[in-house]
Regions:
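Alpha-helical cap/lid subdomain in secreted, periplasmic
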Residues: 76-220
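Short, mixed-charge, low-aromatic patches
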Residues: 1-10, 30-37, 65-73, 112-119, ...
Length: 220
């Protein structure tokens, strides 16, 4: 599964292991996973991260199973399809619709844990991107933003703990990313809810180190 990148003379020290067969990279989750709000398909998270992987020397076979409006309960079906086609690395972006639909954190976290467990048992590396801070969304009335942000953080924490219990890794957005989106309207699309192409670029930059690290471990 690995090769040893060397210099032109073939005798330099190995830098990083890379995949020699295509890395089966699957993106699962909701509208953020699907790329709603981006101007072009090439600007979606999956496409951007696949390019990062290829630039690092990993051949990639990308499949996107994200569905707008999906909640954690929908991961069961998405995971089933992904496993049927084969998956080495899975990126799960989920939680915003659970929050909007008032799904209890314990319920959504359990559904996420079940999904991650199935993928890990099948030999996949799994990276979970927890629920975003919905308090920064313009359509949330000002007086409620602090409350919504607190609920978002509570939900994301439950997801984080569930993903780790199941053997997955977690790529949290953190307050810095939320602050960046809150300060720059250009990072949102016209609906003022989903990221724009520029917003997806910012998110992909934050996720890339996690994805590349997972690929290196798979190739080792």
């Amino acid at each position: 599964m690995t090769s040893s990148p060397t210099g032109n003379n073939g005798d330099l020290a190995t830098l990083y292991p890379v995949m020699t067969s295509p890395l089966r990279f699957c993106v699962l989750g909701d509208s953020l996973a699907a790329g709603v709000g981006s101007s072009r398909e090439d600007d979606t998270l999956g496409r951007r991260l696949a390019r990062r992987l290829r630039d690092a020397g990993h051949p990639v076979h990308l499949r996107n199973f994200g569905v707008p409006g999906a909640r954690s309960a929908d991961l069961e079906r998405q995971v089933g399809v992904a496993l049927g086609e084969g998956v080495d690395l899975a990126l799960i972006v989920i939680g915003a619709n659970d929050l909007a639909g008032f799904v209890a954190p314990a319920v959504g976290a359990r559904q996420l844990q079940d999904a991650v467990t199935r993928l890990v048992r099948a030999g996949a590396r799994v990276i979970v991107v927890p629920a975003p801070d919905l308090g920064i969304v313009a359509r949330v009335p000002g007086p409620y933003r602090q409350l919504v942000s607190a609920a978002s953080g509570h939900y994301a924490q439950a997801q984080t703990e569930a993903a780790i219990r199941a053997g997955g890794a977690v790529a949290t957005a953190g307050p810095e990313l939320a602050a960046r989106f809150a300060a720059d309207p250009a990072l949102f699309s016209a609906d003022r809810f989903h990221p724009s192409s520029a917003g997806y670029a910012v998110i992909a930059d934050g996720l890339a180190p996690h994805v590349l690290d997972a690929a290196r471990h798979l190739a080792a």
